[in-house]
């Protein structure tokens, strides 16, 4: 009987509602931890792994030797490579695709590459308008690498002690 009376007074005085309002009021004046993303940005780590890029040697020749280690080590199976032999007997890629919907940005491809061909850049913000645009092909990867080569080389040199 006492339980029913207590419950009646609690519901009559709306104690649960007042408790919720007090909690809201208490957190209203505390500092906010939310970052308003497009206007404010988090500081990026020097080892941040973002959009991929293929690098070239200083003479302009692409670094990838089509060893397919990155394709083999990729846990998400996001990398597809086709290769062909050239006239001089070396192998080069004819197709190098990365499906960014599958990629988990683990960095294994970058670690396994013996010639530092595939790297992950600092680029975080990219979008796709259509479904097929999520597959980044070899010319696109080379263009990203050409555009950011100075920055990539600088970041690799700064991180060389930890590799």
Swiss-Prot record:
The EC number(s) this enzyme carries: 7.1.1.-
Keyword Disulfide bond tagged: no
Occurrences of domain 4Fe-4S ferredoxin-type (ranges): 54-84, 94-123
Keyword tags: 4Fe-4S, Cell inner membrane, Cell membrane, Iron, Iron-sulfur, Membrane, Metal-binding, NAD, Quinone, Repeat, Translocase, Ubiquinone
GO CC annotations on file: plasma membrane; respiratory chain complex I
Record note on cofactor: Binds 2 [4Fe-4S] clusters per subunit.
Membrane topology according to the record: Peripheral membrane protein
Subcellular location: Cell inner membrane
Binding site for [4Fe-4S] cluster 2: 74, 103, 106, 109
Pfam family membership, one: Fer4_7
Function text: NDH-1 shuttles electrons from NADH, via FMN and iron-sulfur (Fe-S) centers, to quinones in the respiratory chain. The immediate electron acceptor for the enzyme in this species is believed to be ubiquinone. Couples the redox reaction to proton translocation (for every two electrons transferred, four hydrogen ions are translocated across the cytoplasmic membrane), and thus conserves the redox energy in a proton gradient.
Sequence similarity: Belongs to the complex I 23 kDa subunit family.
PANTHER family: NADH DEHYDROGENASE [UBIQUINONE] IRON-SULFUR PROTEIN 8, MITOCHONDRIAL, NADH DEHYDROGENASE UBIQUINONE IRON-SULFUR PROTEIN 8, MITOCHONDRIAL
Subunit structure: NDH-1 is composed of 14 different subunits. Subunits NuoA, H, J, K, L, M, N constitute the membrane sector of the complex.
Name of the molecule in the record: NADH-quinone oxidoreductase subunit I
Species name: Xanthomonas campestris pv. campestris (strain ATCC 33913 / DSM 3586 / NCPPB 528 / LMG 568 / P 25)
């Amino acid at each position: 009987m006492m339980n029913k009376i207590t419950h009646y007074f609690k519901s009559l005085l709306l104690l649960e509602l007042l408790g919720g309002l007090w909690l809201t009021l208490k957190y209203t004046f505390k500092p906010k931890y939310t970052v308003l993303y497009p206007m404010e940005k988090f500081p990026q780590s020097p080892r941040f792994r973002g959009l991929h890029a293929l690098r070239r040697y200083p003479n302009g020749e692409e670094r990838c030797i089509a060893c397919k280690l990155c394709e083999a080590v990729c846990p998400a199976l996001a990398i597809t490579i086709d290769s062909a032999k050239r006239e001089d007997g070396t192998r080069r890629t004819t197709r190098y695709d990365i499906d960014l919907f599958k990629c988990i940005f683990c960095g294994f491809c970058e670690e396994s590459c013996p010639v530092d061909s595939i790297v992950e850049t600092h680029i975080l913000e990219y979008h796709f308008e259509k479904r097929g645009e999520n597959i980044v092909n070899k010319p696109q990867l080379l263009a990203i690498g050409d555009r950011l080569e100075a920055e990539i080389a600088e970041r690799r040199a700064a991180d060389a002690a930890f590799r």
